[in-house]
Amino acid sequence: MKRATVSLAVALLPLVAAAQAPVRVDNKAIARRYFDEILNKGSASAIDSLVAPDVVFRNPPVVVKGIDDFRKLLAALRTAFPDLHFTLEDELAEGNKVATRWVMRGTQGTRKMDVSGMDMFLIEDGKIREIWVNMDTLAQAQQMGTVAGP
């Protein structure tokens, strides 16, 4: 009897994994839309459909809470870098979290920026609830001329 139970459990594992896969795929799609529609295209309406009202955005030392302040942050970013563009290099999903590795490119005045980083998203009820950013701020500062380069 034990052997039959174990065999049945092992046989059902692929079904359980397959049932969980769509959640990860949907969450990855939300993260992709964040980069494409919000960051790359600057779509204000995409913010409403993808971001939770009580979103928390962390890019140390900056912490932004709430969708209104998040909108202001994005507007300032797009003003500083009008041609801002993110290219996704990798993405991983586990449960309600999505990790992305990206390259951010843009121009501020005459200075070009090409910086790599990673984001971790917490997605609940189909909306981004939290974003953690980790990026190469030294490279960004060097490229923008605020810190001497190597």
Task: Label each PLM-derived region with a short phrase.
Residues 120-144:
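Short beta-strand edge/turn micro-motifs at domain boundaries
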Residues 95-104:
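A short hydrophobic beta-strand element
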Residues 7-15:
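Bacterial N-terminal signal peptides
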Residues 25, 44-96:
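A solvent-exposed, acidic/Ser-Thr-rich amphipathic alpha-helical stretch
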Residues 15-49, 53, 145-150:
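Short, low-complexity N-terminal intrinsically disordered segments enriched in polar/charged residues
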Residues 85-86, 113-118:
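Short, surface-exposed coil-to-beta transition loops
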Residues 1-4:
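Positively charged n-region of N-terminal signal peptides that target proteins for export
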Residues 106-108, 123:
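Beta-strand elements of well-folded, non-transmembrane domains
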